[in-house]
Amino acid sequence: MNASPAERMKALRVSRETLDKLEHFAGLFQKWAKSINLVAPSTLEDLWQRHFVDSLQVFRLSPFPKTWVDLGSGGGFPGVITAICLSEHADGWVHLVESNNKKAAFLRVALNETGARGSVHPIRVEQAPSVIPRCEAISARALADLTQLLDYSAPWMLADGSNTIAFFHKGRDYQQEVDKAVSRFQFDLVKHASVVEQDSVVLEIANLSRRTKC
């Protein structure tokens, strides 16, 4: 997205303050990406569309939950983008879970320098529920297949009184993953067409339960 700040602000539908933070994050990302592998190098030339817009669509799908968990945060998509957007909401917070120490260090710098509302947990995804007891939304991008993601998310989504919603980016083969997942779980599913890549989707999942074995 080679555009002026005004054009970007209009296209992304964000405030000038949020755009400033997104642009600062973009600069940090490009600097750090020279030394550590944050995303596929082939996507760096289209950073805004492939990663920023792709991440922003998740935030727009949500009913503005206060507490997010982003699993396998990697280069910060969608976790840091969500945290930046939540900067305008005083009670919002994003927990970024990333076990790679170099990537976790980058995420800390990104949060600190942009003033985004979040914290970094340099732990394995499986350990996250014991550190983060509750959340209202879960996100993950390019982390695992849907069944594994639901296993990771189950401690939050199956908790008594939970209304946690999950948002997972998936490619064109998403239906195969859904078909596999329904053999173990029941859930409400909404498929949102990706605004970035044809045939890709964001899966919105709620009311998760495990199927009872016969």
UniProtKB/Swiss-Prot annotation:
UniProt-annotated binding residues for S-adenosyl-L-methionine: 72, 77, 125-126, 141
Subcellular compartments: Cytoplasm
Keyword tags: Cytoplasm, Methyltransferase, rRNA processing, S-adenosyl-L-methionine, Transferase
Stored InterPro entries: rRNA_ssu_MeTfrase_G, SAM-dependent_MTases_sf
Top-level taxonomic group: Bacteria
Molecular function GO labels: rRNA (guanine-N7-)-methyltransferase activity
A GO term from the CC aspect: cytosol
Swiss-Prot/TrEMBL catalytic activity: guanosine(527) in 16S rRNA + S-adenosyl-L-methionine = N(7)-methylguanosine(527) in 16S rRNA + S-adenosyl-L-homocysteine
EC identifiers of the protein: 2.1.1.170
Function field: Specifically methylates the N7 position of guanine in position 527 of 16S rRNA.
Sequence similarity: Belongs to the methyltransferase superfamily. RNA methyltransferase RsmG family.
Protein name per the record: Ribosomal RNA small subunit methyltransferase G
Species: Sinorhizobium fredii (strain NBRC 101917 / NGR234)
Lineage, highest ranks first: Bacteria, Pseudomonadati, Pseudomonadota, Alphaproteobacteria, Hyphomicrobiales
